[in-house]
A protein has these predicted regions:
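Glycine-rich repeat segments that build the extracellular carbohydrate-interaction surface of secreted
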Residues: 36-41, 59-92, 106-112
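Solenoidal tandem-repeat scaffolds enriched in leucines and small polar residues
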Residues: 170-231, 235-238, 242, 247, ...
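Right-handed parallel beta-helix/beta-spiral solenoid domain characteristic of secreted/periplasmic
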Residues: 94, 103-152, 173-175, 201-202
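Right-handed parallel beta-helix/beta-solenoid
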Residues: 2-63, 307-311, 327-328
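Parallel beta-helix/beta-solenoid
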Residues: 79, 100-104, 123, 132-133, ...
Length: 328
C-alpha cells in the first residue's frame, strides 16, 4: 500500500529512525508528534510493528493507539500533534480517547481515493469516543454499531472533547442498524462538524444528537456544509440543547420513506442560553414544528436566510427564504 492520498498531507518526512525521512516531501503540520501508519491489508502489517514506516504498518487502529499512549507516557509535550494515518480497508476497533492516557491536538486521517475507502465498523459500542481536546477526524466512513455512535464527544466538569473537528466523513446508519452518527454527551465547546455526509439512520437513531448534559449544553458548535438524507431524525436532542451554535450551509433532504419519513430535521432543544444561528441551509419538507423544525425554546435563535421548499408557511417568503423561526 502506497498511501496514495493523505488528507492535509504530508506528515511522513522528518521522523527519527525512518529511512529516507530527509527527503523533502512537504512541510509538517506540527513541530511535535509522531506519525503512525495503519494498514490491515499490508503483507508486513502486525500489531507489534514500529508503525512509523508505511511499509511496516500496524494492522489495527487499536495497536496504533497503544503506541501513541506509550509515546505520551514518555513525553507528554512531544506526543502532542501526533497523527494516525489509516489505509483503505475495514476496521472493527472500538477506541476510547481519554484525557489521562492520550495527548491533545492529534489527528486520525483516512487515506485513499475517496472519503469512503476507510470503513470503521465496530462489532459493538462506539467506534470512537473522545474525551480529550483538539482532535481532528478526517476521511473516515463510519458504520456505527447498534449500541454506539460513530464518534462520541464527551465533556464534564470543565474538561473533555472541546475543539474537536470532524470533517470529510461519511456516517452511514446502514439502513437503521447504527445507533448514532455523532453523539454529544455533556457540553464540549467549539466543536466543528463539516463537509460530512449522514444517511440511513432510523427512528430514535439520529445523525447528530445530545444524549446527556450533566453540567451544560454543547456551546459554540459549528455544523457546516453537511448533507443529511434518507434518515428519520437528523439533528435532535435527548437531553439539553444547543447554545450559541452555528448551523449553516447544510442540505436537509426529506427521506423517500424506505426507512420511514423524516420526522426531525433540526431540534435545538431546551438549553439555558440559545442564541443559535441557523442560516444559509436548504430545508426540505414542512418548515414547522410539526414538520420537524424546532428552534431553541428561549426564542432568541436566528433562522432568517435559509431556503425552504415550504413557501406556504408564514415564516417563509414567496421566494423560499425563511424570515422567522419555525412555528407550530
Amino acid at each position: 500500500m502506497n498511501f496514495p492520498l493523505i488528507r492535509q498531507q504530508p506528515w511522513y518526512p522528518g521522523q527519527m529512525g525512518v529511512p529516507g525521512s530527509d527527503v523533502s516531501r512537504g512541510l509538517r503540520t506540527q513541530p511535535n508528534g509522531i506519525v503512525l501508519f495503519v494498514d490491515g491489508n499490508h503483507p508486513n502489517a502486525t500489531t507489534t510493528a514500529d508503525g512509523t514506516d508505511p511499509n511496516n504498518p500496524l494492522s489495527t487502529i487499536t495497536a496504533a493507539m497503544a503506541k501513541l499512549v506509550a509515546f505520551h507516557a514518555l513525553s507528554e509535550v512531544q506526543a502532542e500533534g501526533s497523527t494516525i494515518v489509516i489505509a483503505p480497508g475495514t476496521y472493527t476497533d472500538s477506541i476510547a480517547i481519554d484525557r489521562t492516557s492520550y495527548p491533545p491536538d492529534c489527528s486520525i486521517i483516512g487515506c485513499g481515493n475517496s472519503k469512503f475507502d476507510v470503513v470503521w465498523v465496530p462489532a459493538a459500542g462506539d467506534a470512537l469516543s473522545i474525551d480529550q481536546s483538539g482532535w481532528l477526524i478526517d476521511g473516515i466512513h463510519f458504520q456505527p454499531a447498534a449500541d454506539g455512535a460513530g464518534v462520541k464527544l464527551t465533556w464534564n466538569a470543565g474538561a473533555g472533547a472541546e475543539d474537536t473537528i470532524i470533517q470529510n466523513c461519511f456516517f452511514d446508519g446502514r439502513w437503521g442498524t447504527g445507533l448514532y452518527g455523532v453523539e454529544f454527551e455533556g457540553a464540549p465547546a467549539n466543536c466543528t462538524i463539516q463537509d460530512c455526509r449522514f444517511a440511513e439512520f432510523d427512528t430514535a437513531q439520529p445523525c447528530i444528537t445530545i444524549t446527556a448534559t450533566p453540567t451544560a449544553s454543547p456551546y459554540q458548535t459549528h455544523i457546516l456544509r453537511n448533507t443529511f438524507q434518507e434518515a428519520v431524525e437528523y439533528i435532535t436532542i435527548e437531553a439539553g440543547g444547543f447554545n450559541a451554535s452555528i448551523i449553516a450551509g447544510n442540505h436537509f433532504v426529506q427521506a423517500t420513506g424506505d426507512l420511514g419519513a423524516t420526522t426531525t430535521y433540526i431540534n435545538l432543544g431546551t438549553g439555558s442560553l440559545g442564541y443559535n444561528q441557523v442560516v444559509g441551509n436548504y430545508f426540505d419538507g414542512d418548515y414547522s414544528n410539526t414538520g420537524g423544525y424546532t428552534a431553541e425554546t428561549n426564542g432568541n435563535d436566528n433562522w432568517v436566510g435559509n431556503f425552504a421548499a415550504d413557501v406556504a408557511e408564514a415564516e417563509v417568503g414567496d421566494n423560499g427564504i425563511t424570515v422567522a423561526e419555525p412555528a407550530a
